[in-house]
């Protein structure tokens, strides 16, 4: 009996991480076609995670990044459409709310069933591009797999059929469990000359925090004040786009804020579980803070955003929504 042909499309660090365990299982049970859109093309945002998580190379690389956002989105849809016509998958699997997920539009036009993991997340901030992507993909998907009851209720309230909506939880727990020994064994503190609980870890890369000038200035002014108040190193795992923006703005960071290229999966999580606090706008922070609390490595998770699509993390009390202003972040 022939296996069903499944096309799985990824394109960014969070998708690679969250889907890593799922991809391995899908290789066993399906004839899986693994596709990378190329949305994140830097080694430290891409290949290092394939290596850390033991993932095989994608079967196809779409090289979809264009000269601007419009061209990139167009390339993702057009190139995935052509590949689907060529490969004729029985189903499409996507996760999340990145531009790579807009490949679902191509699948819908080709009548290919769409399975969407991380469905139903809502932050109710229409200014965020991810919110637009979520609404588009959720409403054209054939099966929506939600992380929480919150997400399921949002979809049902928007009219999505209940028989198409399931609460599966996040695949992140399996990924972290499988890698916990390697995370704990990382020697990144020694390599960077850091002491446990005597540094903060910073990650700031979201479009609304980096590209909007007022938000950018408010946020990094807050970070400088944080360094001055606590007088400890702040290790900034800095996305290339964020570094480019810092340079272009000529913003002077406090000398205690240390820029570092994006870190690998094991090193970054070792830094999180040993930090005095983690200050981040990362989409994986809610799951990471919840997981490490459950295995005896809790850390204060301070989310530098004004909204969140993960209210279940707030319910658990391991994750705080701080905003980006000086008073909010420090408090």
Kindly label every feature range from the protein language model.
Residues 39, 47, 183-274:
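Donor-nucleotide binding loops and adjacent catalytic segments primarily
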Residues 2-12, 305-306:
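Nucleotide-activated donor-dependent transferases that construct or modify glycoconjugates
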Residues 40-56:
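N-terminal beta-loop-helix "entrance" segment that forms/cooperates
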């Amino acid at each position: 009996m022939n296996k069903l042909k499944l096309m799985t499309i990824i394109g960014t660090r969070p998708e690679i991480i969250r889907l890593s365990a799922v991809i391995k299982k899908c290789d066993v049970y399906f004839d899986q076609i693994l596709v990378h859109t190329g949305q994140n093309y830097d080694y430290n945002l891409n290949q290092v995670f394939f290596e850390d998580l033991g993932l095989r190379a994608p079967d196809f690389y779409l090289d979809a990044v264009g000269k601007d956002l419009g061209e990139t989105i167009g390339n993702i849809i057009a190139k995935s459409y052509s590949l689907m016509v060529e490969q004729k998958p029985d189903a499409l699997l996507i996760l999340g709310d990145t531009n790579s997920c807009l490949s679902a539009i191509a699948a819908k036009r080709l009548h290919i069933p769409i399975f969407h993991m991380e469905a139903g997340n809502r932050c109710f901030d229409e200014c965020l591009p991810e919110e637009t992507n979520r609404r588009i993909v959720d409403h054209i998907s054939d099966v929506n797999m939600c992380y929480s009851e919150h997400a399921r209720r949002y979809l049902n309230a928007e009219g999505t059929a209940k028989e198409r909506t399931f609460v599966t939880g996040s695949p992140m727990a399996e990924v972290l469990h499988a890698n916990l020994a390697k995370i704990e064994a990382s020697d990144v503190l020694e390599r960077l000359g850091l002491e446990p609980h005597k540094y903060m870890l910073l990650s700031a890369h979201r479009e609304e925090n980096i590209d909007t000038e007022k938000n950018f200035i408010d946020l990094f002014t807050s970070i400088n004040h944080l360094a001055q108040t606590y007088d400890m190193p702040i290790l900034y795992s800095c996305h290339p786009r964020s570094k480019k923006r810092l340079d272009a703005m000529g913003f002077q960071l406090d000398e205690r804020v240390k820029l570092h290229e994006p870190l690998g999966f094991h090193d970054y999580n070792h830094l999180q579980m040993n930090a005095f606090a983690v200050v981040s706008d990362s989409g994986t922070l809610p799951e990471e803070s919840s997981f490490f609390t459950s295995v005896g490595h809790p850390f204060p998770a301070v989310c530098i955003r004004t909204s969140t699509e993960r209210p279940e993390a707030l319910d658990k009390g391991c994750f705080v929504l701080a905003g980006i202003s000086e008073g909010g972040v420090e408090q």
